[in-house]
Regions:
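Extreme N-terminal starter segment of soluble prokaryotic enzymes
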Residues: 1-5
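Structural signal for conserved beta-strand scaffold positions within catalytic alpha/beta enzyme cores
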Residues: 7, 29, 65, 96, ...
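Short, glycine-/small- and polar/acidic-enriched structural segments
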Residues: 8-91, 98-100
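Ligand-binding cleft/hinge of the Venus flytrap
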Residues: 13-24, 103-121
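Short helix-initiation/N-cap motifs at beta->coil->alpha
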Residues: 27-40, 116-134
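Structured N-terminal alpha/beta-domain signature
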Residues: 39, 68-69, 107, 134, ...
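Pocket-lining segment of extracytoplasmic ligand-binding domains
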Residues: 119-155
Length: 155
């Protein structure tokens, strides 16, 4: 019986291990937002999840030590575009252009820890907002800017 590892289709990385096929490792395409449920349902035995999602999976998964995804320079895949400077966003309306909970949590932590601020929740892009967070390929496509938003932050 093969070990099924989730390959996140909306990120620019892929899990690999030497001689995967010979070792009985099979990749299954899964969306990042669907990975936690795929792990819970047993569709996959392993796969990358966001740090935020990992907290809710400790009853069904064990973290694998020694592995992580990181960037030493600006990644450009978790962005905040704002009409106001970051330090003025506490209590303002913030939209989420993508459904990535990690990017939203990165923004919350940055605002709270660096600027002693907070927000209640994120709104849809169609609603009036002062700033928006965006992640993944959508953020990479908009890495040069967003019309009407003078401030850009790489979270």
């Amino acid at each position: 019986m093969p070990t099924v590892v989730g390959r996140v289709i909306d990120l620019n990385f892929e899990p690999f291990y030497i001689d995967m096929v010979r070792r009985g490792i099979v990749l299954q395409d899964v969306s990042l937002k669907d990975m936690p449920q795929a792990l819970r349902d047993g569709v996959v035995s392993a796969g990358p999840v966001s740090l935020v999602d990992s907290f809710a999976l400790d009853d069904v998964c064990d973290p694998v030590a020694g592995f992580c995804l990181a960037a030493s320079n600006r990644a450009g895949s978790n962005l905040l575009y704002s009409k106001k400077p970051l330090e003025e966003l506490s209590g303002r309306t913030i939209a989420a252009a993508t459904a990535d909970s990690t990017t939203q949590e990165l923004f919350r932590v940055l605002l709270a820890e660096k600027h002693d601020g907070n927000i209640d929740s994120f709104v849809a892009m169609a609603e009036e907002h002062d700033a928006f967070v965006i992640s993944g390929d959508d953020a990479l496509r908009r890495r040069r800017g967003a019309r009407g938003y003078q401030h850009r932050y790489d979270l």
